[in-house]
Design a protein with these regions (language model features):
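C-terminal-of-GTPase-core extension/linker across diverse P-loop GTPases
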Residues: 2-172
């Protein structure tokens, strides 16, 4: 299972915005039935619940089982973390997402999202400009992150989203 040290290292990687793959080694040494892999992945996902974006791969370094897939996955994750998405394409995804689920309201005030742009890579970092950042609920931010992930993949990399009120002069 996931050790305390695994959890600490994973937490440091997550906080630092590093792309990650969760690799479970010594797969050859585990007694398996038809549900072993599924149960193990559920356990790993529960213990590292903040890393939902990280793929889980079961390998055996001793026998070489799935090691070739690991290198393909590393290439894929590195490319995803460095991906740049044009502002126009991002804003189409944003418009589609808002059409499916309207932005939240609070005491009659509706959140208006003006646009989104990417300001960094490794990890992908986006900034969303809106009328009132206080109206931007974390669940709607997570919804938009999931829409971006669903559209562009972004496997194995955290995604950063910063909310800015129009007229804010803060550093990005």
């Amino acid at each position: 299972g996931v050790t305390e040290q695994d959890t600490k290292v994973a937490g440091l990687a997550h906080e630092a915005g590093k792309a990650c793959i969760i690799v479970v080694n010594k797969w050859d040494a585990i007694e398996k039935d038809g549900k072993t892999m599924q149960r193990m992945e559920e356990d790993v996902r529960r213990d590292l619940s903040y890393m939902t974006y990280a793929p889980v791969l079961f390998i055996s370094a001793l026998t070489g089982q799935r090691v070739d897939r690991l290198f393909d996955l590393i290439d894929n994750v590195v490319n995803q973390a460095a991906m740049r998405i044009p502002t126009g394409v991002l804003n189409q995804v944003l418009a589609d997402a808002q059409a499916r689920v309207q932005p939240p309201t609070d005491k009659g005030r509706r959140l208006k999202i003006y646009y989104m742009t990417q300001i960094g890579v490794k990890p992908p970092h986006f900034v969303i400009f809106c009328n009132d950042a206080r109206l931007f609920h974390f669940s709607y931010q997570r919804y938009l992150e999931n829409q971006i992930r669903g559209t562009f993949g972004l496997t194995g990399t955290p995604v950063r989203i910063t909310i800015r009120q129009k007229g804010d002069k803060e550093e990005l």
